[in-house]
């Protein structure tokens, strides 16, 4: 049973998946930082210094806080600013992954096209083809 598990774990697809998950987790942290530290501050500056992560709509009159963390402690809120930031994260990740997969598919198609084209016949093969064609035609060459 241990041998079977080792064979399964060492298959290319499982190892590739593990590497992809690890790289994806690291990439997610980069995208989160890019959105939170670079993109949202620029959007905030353009919109007059707004911090979208703290934007919320209280669902009860008991919520009087000015920050999202405090408002969540006081009652139910719609944290639409946080949702906007997370949605932007998702769109960036999806766009980058789409680009990577598209590039990989293009490379794969190119590799398949190169592999599918037959190799040029060697000089020996060309001579054998000529001899075959002469024999098929029934004409005897003059020697």
Swiss-Prot record:
One of its GO terms (cellular component) is plasma membrane. It comes from the Bacteria. GO terms for molecular function: mechanosensitive monoatomic ion channel activity. Keywords: Cell inner membrane, Cell membrane, Ion channel, Ion transport, Membrane, Transmembrane, Transmembrane helix, Transport. It is a multi-pass membrane protein. The chain crosses the membrane at residues 19-39, 81-101. The keyword Isomerase does not apply. It is found in: Cell inner membrane. Pfam families: MscL (PF01741). Channel that opens in response to stretch forces in the membrane lipid bilayer. May participate in the regulation of osmotic pressure changes within the cell. Belongs to the MscL family. Homopentamer. NCBIfam families: mscL, PRK00567.1-4, PRK13952.1. This is Large-conductance mechanosensitive channel. The gene is mscL.
């Amino acid at each position: 049973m241990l041998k079977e598990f080792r064979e399964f774990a060492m298959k290319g697809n499982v190892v590739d998946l593990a590497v992809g998950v690890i790289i994806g987790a690291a990439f997610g942290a980069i995208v989160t930082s890019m959105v939170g530290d670079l993109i949202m501050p620029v959007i905030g500056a353009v919109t007059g210094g707004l911090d979208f992560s703290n934007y919320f709509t209280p669902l009860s009159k008991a919520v009087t806080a000015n920050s999202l963390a405090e408002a969540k402690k006081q009652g139910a809120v719609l944290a639409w600013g946080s949702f906007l930031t997370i949605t932007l994260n998702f769109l960036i990740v999806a766009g980058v992954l789409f680009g990577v997969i598209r590039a990989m598919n293009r490379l794969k198609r190119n590799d398949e096209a190169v592999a599918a084209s037959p190799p040029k016949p060697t000089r020996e093969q060309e001579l054998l083809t000529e001899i075959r064609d002469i024999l098929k035609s029934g004409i005897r060459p003059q020697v």
